[in-house]
């Protein structure tokens, strides 16, 4: 289960997929120090969620915990909102991962054949292909999930060591320590403080999705121990691998402008090529990460199918009867997986028309997860301060007296992050670079409110 969870969190490769955000908004110092800070507070969130998961191991995860732990008059409404944000986070993150994996493939093609120009529709079609393969494997090869999880954990860790050791060993023109740890880079047009806040978003994106084991609890043995441990361990592994990899990338980075505007569309590929000086070597290293992203696509498809199934089983979705069925022969929620694939493809289709629209999907993906994490933490805080009889949760991961501190620290960070996800990232702001996350979130909340009536 740790392998399954880390294949989704896989922070070191996730950070490389959105590297351009950190490069332009504060540069290496913000990327590195914000990563340390984000991971520290994310551990508070992870331990809080692990405590609830060990007490209530159900496939619904955070929305089920809210339904159980919230005051009765608020439980239904809060659980419903939490479930929808959880679902939109999982589904949109799957689309984002498909896009990132596709970008790696197209970036390698551009590096190998410089005359090839990457078009937006190329990226969408490759994302479609990844989505289809992930859906088919989730439907017809679920019996291989445990083996794949174990194998990808080994592949993930080995790829991490191969990538960072290779670029450090081959790069003979490394950046000075001052560039990595002190020199502030700002291409946003905003002041330094604002740019630093925007730069934190890269770290926030790289450290989420660690709720995945909670949605698999009904299919694993000893779920009260295994799932919470996987939640916590995926954050620890993500922190350590992400920290080392970020420092390695920053030392081996070329010029900021050159890295951010690489024709491959992937700054990581530019850094690999700047270090190795070899197209073949760069493609070999990028291929290692591409495999991680492809397996992540399968894991997110599996998680999404289970989340749709669980929410439909609790009658939280339209067409709940159909979406909550488990195929009698295959033993998986086929309708839930197909619905997940359809929504992912729809999100990817936005890139046909607008880059800004798809960037909004990236923000919504992280915001969806973070809101769904924040609601159960808020419920736990209210339970503790109000003296609710369920103040202490029994389970292998009970936090005891440290629970309130973890809940408060985690909730404070999540609330801050959810607000900053709505900030514009470039000044001057116009209709092309505006951050439409707040508008999309408002429309989403309006829609689920109308459905609830």
From Swiss-Prot:
It is a multi-pass membrane protein. GO terms for cellular component: membrane. Disulfide bonds: none annotated. One of its GO terms (molecular function) is transmembrane transporter activity. It is found in: Membrane. Its main location: membrane. Glycans are attached at residues 110, 186, 274, 435. Pfam families: AA_permease_2. It comes from the Eukaryota. Keywords: Glycoprotein, Membrane, Transmembrane, Transmembrane helix, Transport. The chain crosses the membrane at residues 2-21, 30-50, 81-101, 121-141, 151-171, 193-213, 231-251, 277-297, 330-350, 358-378, 403-423. Belongs to the amino acid-polyamine-organocation (APC) superfamily. This is Putative amino acid/polyamine transporter MPH_07630_2.
């Amino acid at each position: 289960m740790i392998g399954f969870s880390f294949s989704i969190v896989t922070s070191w490769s996730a950070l490389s997929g959105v590297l351009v955000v950190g490069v332009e908004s504060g540069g290496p110092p913000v990327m590195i120090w914000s990563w340390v800070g984000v991971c520290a507070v994310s551990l508070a969130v992870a331990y809080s969620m692990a405590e609830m998961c060990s007490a209530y191991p159900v496939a619904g995860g955070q929305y089920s915990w809210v339904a159980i732990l919230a005051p009765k008059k608020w439980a239904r409404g809060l659980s419903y909102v939490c479930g929808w944000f959880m679902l939109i986070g999982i589904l949109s993150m799957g689309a984002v991962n498909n896009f990132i994996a596709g970008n790696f493939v197209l970036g390698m093609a551009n590096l190998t054949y410089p005359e090839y120009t990457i078009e937006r529709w190329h990226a969408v079609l490759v994302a479609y292909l990844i989505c289809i393969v992930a859906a088919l494997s989730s439907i017809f090869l679920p019996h291989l999930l445990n083996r794949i999880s174990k194998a990808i954990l080994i592949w993930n860790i080995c790829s991490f060591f191969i990538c960072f050791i290779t670029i450090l060993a081959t790069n003979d023109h490394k950046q000075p320590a001052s560039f990595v740890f002190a020199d502030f880079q700002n291409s946003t047009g905003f002041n330094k403080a604002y740019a630093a806040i925007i730069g934190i978003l890269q770290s926030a994106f790289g450290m989420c999705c660690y709720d995945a084991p909670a949605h698999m609890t009904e299919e694993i043995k000893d779920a009260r121990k295994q799932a919470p441990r996987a939640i916590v361990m995926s954050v620890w592994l993500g922190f350590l691998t992400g920290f080392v990899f970020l420092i390695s990338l920053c030392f081996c980075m070329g010029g900021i402008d050159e890295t951010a505007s690489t024709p491959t569309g992937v700054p990581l590929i530019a850094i690999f090529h700047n270090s190795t000086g070899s197209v073949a070597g760069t493609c070999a290293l990028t291929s290692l990460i591409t495999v991680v992203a492809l397996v992540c696509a399968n894991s997110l498809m599996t998680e999404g199918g289970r989340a749709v199934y669980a929410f439909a089983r609790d009658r939280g979705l339209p067409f709940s009867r159909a979406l909550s069925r488990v195929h009698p022969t295959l033993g998986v929620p086929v309708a839930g997986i197909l619905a997940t694939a359809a929504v992912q493809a729809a999100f990817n289709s936005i890139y046909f028309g607008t880059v800004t629209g798809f960037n909004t999907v990236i923000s919504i993906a992280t915001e969806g997860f973070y809101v769904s994490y924040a609601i159960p933490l808020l419920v736990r805080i209210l339970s503790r301060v109000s003296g609710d009889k369920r103040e202490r949760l029994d389970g292998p991961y009970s936090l005891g007296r440290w629970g309130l501190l973890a809940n408060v620290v985690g909730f404070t960070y999540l609330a801050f992050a959810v607000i900053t996800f709505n900030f514009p990232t470039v000044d001057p702001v116009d209709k092309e670079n505006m951050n439409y996350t707040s508008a999309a979130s408002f429309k989403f909340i309006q829609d689920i409110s109308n459905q609830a009536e």
